[in-house]
Amino acid sequence: DMDGVLFNSMPNHAESWHKVMLRFGFGLSRDEAYMHEGRTGASTINIVSRRERGHDATEEEIKAIYQAKTEEFNKCPMAERMPGAYEVLTKIKEEGLIPMVVTGSGQTSLLDRLNHNFPGIFKKELMVTAFDVKYGKPNPEPYLMALKKAHLQPNEALVIENAPLGVQAGVAAGIFTIAVNTGPLPDQVLWDEGANLLFPSMPAFNENWEI
């Protein structure tokens, strides 16, 4: 996963969702935004719309809200590299494993940003983004697509996730899934989604890599 694992970008996403939904007359707390991490924008908007109005948002509403959310997010300072992430990726490479990014993001500058922060780690053909899949997390499709791209079986891979929906997707794909709780949610939320291991941070995961 990228947001919340490689980059400390989730506070910006949560704040942007909270502000913009309020502007459009909806209630979405920052903590709830973390619960929806990994969903498509339309799915997040419709969950709140159904809860508060009893029906889905219109296509026009979804477009307007998501555009406003993107603009709000782009005003935020650039997210820093998550502490410990580079060290974990270096160990992954040293072990002869293949590092891949599986993200719901569709930013066109993604590879440039990854290469700038994690030089020599990722290859474009070994990335799964919003453009590669029809269904977002919690559907297992993004992780199944990653296995297909790398020519791997589920028992030959590891998933590293911070989001409940991402953990759910990894588990549903049949992959050993490690949760790293870099956000404000209780650990139990990640355990409940089926995480096989859980660490409180990327540095903690790095220190226990040999496990």
Language model features: what each stretch is:
Residues 14, 18, 41-46, 107, ...:
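An amphipathic alpha-helix signature
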Residues 38-72, 83, 91:
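A metal-dependent, Asp-based hydrolase signature
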Residues 2-32:
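Active-site neighborhood of HAD-like aspartate-dependent phosphohydrolases
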Residues 23-26, 53-60, 118-123, 151:
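Short helix-capping segments at alpha-helix termini
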Residues 22, 93, 171:
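Anion (oxyanion) recognition and catalysis
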Residues 74-101, 108:
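Short, acidic loop-to-helix structural element flanking the phosphoryl-transfer center
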Residues 86, 90, 106-211:
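Asp-based, Mg2+/Mn2+-dependent phosphohydrolase catalytic module
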Residues 5, 103-105:
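Conserved phosphate-coupling serine/threonine residues in phosphotransfer and NTP-handling enzymes
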